[in-house]
Amino acid sequence: GDSATVFDTEFGKIGLCICFDIRFPEIFRRMVLEGADIVLVPAAFNMTTGPAHWELTFRARALDNQIFVFGTSPARDLSASYQAFGHSIAVSPWGRVLNQMDEHEGMQITTIDLDEITSVREQLPLLKTRMENL
């Protein structure tokens, strides 16, 4: 598409992108500028990119934009032709991993406090001090 996907919910403003989009900081910044507090990323990294980049990219996007980022992944199916890395993840605006699963099927519930976004942005005012003129 040619625009960011951000929508209002009873939980806050949520941004949505998919798998490969996590690699582009610009998409996340656009969603944050449109008010996203949370970004959801359904993704299926493989066994090459997953171990190397999964946690790193999710933590970077959360920290860069001081938002909550959630990545969901299929469980690894050893009988399938495509081997997903798994490791669904929840990351805080400080870049801290709140929850991370392994490669198996399962479910975790992560409780978040959207006030943490304000607190983090007061401690480290990245959005207020960004260099828009570059």
Please annotate each region the language model reported.
Residues 106-122:
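A short, polar/charged loop-to-alpha-helix boundary motif
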Residues 21-25, 114-117:
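Alpha-helix N-cap/helix-start and coil->helix boundary motif
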Residues 3-15, 38:
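Beta-strand-turn-beta hairpins that frame and shape the catalytic cleft
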Residues 117-134:
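A conserved C-terminal secondary-structure "cap"
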Residues 4-6, 17, 22, 31:
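Conserved catalytic scaffold of divalent metal-dependent phosphoesterases
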Residues 13, 23-108:
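CN hydrolase (nitrilase-like) catalytic-core segments centered on the catalytic cysteine
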Residues 20, 56-58, 118, 127:
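Short alpha-helical segments used as structural interaction elements across diverse proteins
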